[in-house]
A protein has these predicted regions:
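N-terminal hydrophobic/helix-forming segments and targeting peptides
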Residues: 1-360
Length: 360
């Protein structure tokens, strides 16, 4: 991959560790450790709050206070019932498209270690006409770990009610600068804010810059709420994936026209401060950073939503990394979009000063 040479090996290795380490919402500790390890050499301060958010700061006493948020959790499954015949029934952690679940290889993460399994369902050959016409219901699916001795064999393997599970897919390079992985939503956002912090350190910002690996975004933007309250930033910019529309079935009239490889996106709409968005667009044009415009009329389903209304409110922005096939085991991104997002955030943070007025 020609593009990979533009990203330091250590940064690319960090990204691979992030996407290959399972961390569904509520179980983010392993990836929080990766984040802390990566930012430690250049951050002036690294802390972890009671929710599990990792907060890395450069120039923490500076002004204004700027929060960059990228969530490190992912969608997954939670075991809630083990049947007498040894089937592990589950609920979704975050939102799932049930159509893609059947037959997927998964891993249950137990206190005794990982237990592989497969999501099972009644074969199509045995479905009645009525059953074939129904939507796939998660309640009709189960995780099969190969047990033939019923519930006792499953328990002996270490599986318990309350254990999380995730898809068994890691990082896969594709053509050009593209890559596929299970959890680019939103490990790529966490990677971007960490990389932005590393780069802004070299620019000696006047602002206090806080890169936050937020938790539990997929179940209600919970980590962003608490970390934003604690940091009390003047400016908050979230980084998350957004819908690429450069493949079949995507109706640009209903979403936007966004493509892989054409740069990160900047939100325009109620969930973004207009002055900040315009400032970032001007910076991107001056620095020749590829970028795309995205529009949403109301709140978004991202950390930017929680950040904007934290305490008495803050100046908020949202940067997106275009992604194909969101919330599936095979999400695809362009590495150049992520690299450009990190650069964009770094120069943005370096441009901010205590006398700036972003009030609408």
């Amino acid at each position: 991959l020609e593009f990979v040479s533009l990203i330091p090996d250590s940064a690319l290795d960090f990204l691979k560790r992030l996407v290959e380490t399972p961390s569904p919402s509520g179980f983010e500790e392993a990836n929080a450790a990766h984040f802390r390890e990566y930012v430690a050499p250049f951050a002036d301060r690294v802390t972890t709050d009671p929710m599990g958010n990792v907060i890395a700061a450069v120039n923490p006493e500076g002004s204004p206070r700027v929060m960059l948020a990228g969530h490190i959790d992912e969608i997954g499954f939670l075991i809630h019932y083990i049947s007498d015949d040894g089937c592990c029934y589950f609920r979704g952690i975050g939102g799932h498209d049930n159509v893609v679940l059947v037959g997927q290889r998964v891993v249950i993460h137990t206190n005794q270690g990982p237990v592989p399994g497969v999501i099972g369902k009644k074969p199509i050959h045995l479905l009645t006409d009525e059953e074939r016409g129904k939507k796939v219901d998660m309640a009709d699916l189960w995780i099969d770990i190969g047990a033939t001795g019923g519930r006792e064999e499953v328990l002996a393997a270490g599986v318990r009610v309350g254990d999380p599970a995730t898809y068994e897919y890691g990082y896969t390079p594709l053509l050009g600068d593209r890559a596929a992985a299970r959890a680019f939503d939103n490990r790529i956002g966490a990677w971007v804010v960490a990389e932005a912090l590393r780069r802004v350190k070299e620019l000696n910002p006047k602002a206090a810059v806080f890169a936050v690996a937020t938790v539990q975004e997929e179940v209600g933007l919970r980590g962003a709420r608490t970390s934003a309250y604690g940091i009390d930033p003047h400016v908050g910019i979230a980084v998350d994936v957004t819908f690429a529309t450069d493949y079949p079935s995507m109706d640009k009239r209903k979403v936007s026209e966004l493509s892989l490889g054409k740069g990160p996106t900047i939100l325009r709409g109620a969930n973004a401060n207009r002055k900040l968005a315009d400032h970032m667009i001007r910076l991107a044009e001056e620095k020749s950073i590829p970028h795309q415009l995205e529009a949403t009329p109301g709140g978004t389903g991202t950390d930017a939503n929680a950040m904007q209304i934290s305490r008495a409110g803050m100046i908020t922005g949202l940067v997106g990394v275009p992604l194909r096939y969101m919330h599936t085991p095979g999400e695809i991104i362009s590495l150049s979009d992520a690299d450009n997002a990190a650069e964009w955030l770094a120069v943005t943070c370096a441009s901010l000063g205590s006398g700036d007025d972003w009030t609408p």
